[in-house]
């Protein structure tokens, strides 16, 4: 299967939850999911030491990597402007970059973060909750 989905950090950080794992595993096994470089940075930020950081990076390598580009940054700025026009400022910069990468590559952003509903409302891009909102936190 070709790439179809882009994982947000909100999904990756919840892979220990059975419902999230059940949703992601078949997609990962089919080679249908990717992650972005900003996601690697977000996940690596939580590492308490080098050993844990290395373990996290190895785990992330199970997903294809979408490299950050200048066009992602330009689009993230554009999305930020569209949100500001609606007085919906304050969306996290990593979310804007992930959304921009997903949009450019024609991928559905899989998330567990309401910010993506706001982003999708201005971009029209496909975003999907990995499990229904409010069911695991």
UniProtKB/Swiss-Prot annotation:
The keyword RNA-binding does not apply. SUPFAM superfamilies: PIN domain-like (SSF88723). It is an enzyme of class 3 (hydrolase). Its EC number is 3.1.-.-. CDD domains: PIN_MtVapC3_VapC21-like. The keyword Hydrolase applies. Mg(2+) binds at residues 8, 95. Residues 5-120 form the PINc domain. Toxic component of a type II toxin-antitoxin (TA) system. An RNase. Its cognate antitoxin is VapB51. HAMAP family: VapC_Nob1. This is Ribonuclease VapC51. The gene is vapC51.
């Amino acid at each position: 299967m070709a790439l179809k989905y882009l994982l947000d950090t909100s999904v990756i950080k919840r892979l220990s939850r059975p419902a999230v794992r059940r949703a992601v595993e078949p997609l990962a096994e089919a080679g249908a999911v990717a992650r972005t470089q900003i996601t690697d940075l977000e996940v690596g930020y939580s590492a308490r030491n080098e050993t844990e950081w290395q373990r996290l990076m190895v785990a992330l390598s199970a997903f294809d990597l979408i490299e950050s580009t200048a066009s992602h940054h330009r689009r993230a700025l554009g999305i930020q402007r569209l949100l500001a026009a609606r007085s919906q400022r304050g969306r996290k910069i990593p979310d804007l970059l992930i959304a921009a990468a997903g949009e450019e590559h024609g991928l559905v952003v899989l998330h567990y973060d309401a910010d993506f509903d706001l982003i999708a409302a201005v971009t029209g891009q496909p975003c999907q909750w990995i499990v229904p909102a409010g069911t695991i936190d």
